[in-house]
From Swiss-Prot:
Principal subcellular localization: host cell
Name of the protein in question: Putative transmembrane protein ORF202
Subcellular location: Host membrane
Keywords: Host membrane, Membrane, Transmembrane, Transmembrane helix
Membrane topology, as annotated: Multi-pass membrane protein
Stretches that traverse the bilayer: 13-33, 40-60, 87-107, 156-176, 177-197
Superkingdom of the organism of origin: Viruses
Gene Ontology cellular component annotations, sorted alphabetically: host cell membrane; membrane
Disulphide connectivity of cysteines: none
Length: 202
């Protein structure tokens, strides 16, 4: 199994949380959809976006992504968390639901690591591709070196797509453009992480 599998899933969950928080700040769907209906829609969207196997990894991604979305939402809004609905209790500025989600995600990832002999080291993932056994191959597959020395053209394209999407989301007042830019952000982030994970820098 790819030793980067857990790291890729962590980054994907956080990236989707960030993308959705930007969308929610600019297009507050909960203003137009009944509370219960919106929560069902919200859970379905996050479940689909984080769908993977095994179940423990899916649960970790699912809850981490939702907690990340809330965290990024409050940061972007520059607000202290408050209880906006009965299902989102907040005590002294601490969102209890997010704390529970983080705890569940940690235990889910722990279970996954214990039962699948999987490890993650995000710094090693960024700088060296450990799937290659020889030291010369590892040096050739050092994505950080390739990225900083003009040898990662595909990653530059994906990163440009991500940056343009973020700018479009922040400056757009059109629902259709915001939705399209958010989709581009998710796709661009996924491509960037996937290319980096496979040491593809031609």
């Amino acid at each position: 199994m790819n030793t980067h599998y857990l790291t890729i899933n962590l980054l994907r969950a956080i990236a989707f949380g960030l993308a959705y928080s930007i969308l929610e700040v600019n297009v507050p769907l909960f203003h137009y959809i009944p509370v219960v209906d919106y929560r069902v829609f919200y859970l379905i969207i996050f479940a689909i976006a984080n769908m993977t196997l095994p179940l423990s990894l899916f649960l970790g991604n699912f809850f981490l992504s939702m907690a990340s979305e809330d965290m990024f939402y409050w940061i972007i809004k520059a607000q202290t968390p408050f209880q906006y609905a009965w299902y989102y209790p907040v005590i002294d500025g601490i969102p209890i639901a997010d704390v529970i989600e983080v705890i569940i995600s940690v235990f889910s990832y722990y279970y996954y690591v214990r039962h699948h002999n999987e490890t993650t080291n995000i710094f090693h993932f960024i700088f060296v591709d450990t799937d290659n056994t020889s030291s010369s191959q590892q040096q050739q597959c050092g994505m950080w070196y390739a990225f900083t020395h003009g040898k990662a053209h595909d990653e530059y394209g994906a990163l440009t797509l991500v940056l343009v999407s973020v700018l479009a989301i922040l400056s757009s007042h059109s629902l259709s453009l915001t939705a399209f830019a958010t989709l581009s952000l998710i796709v661009g982030t996924g491509i960037f992480v996937d290319l980096w994970a496979h040491c593809f820098h031609h």
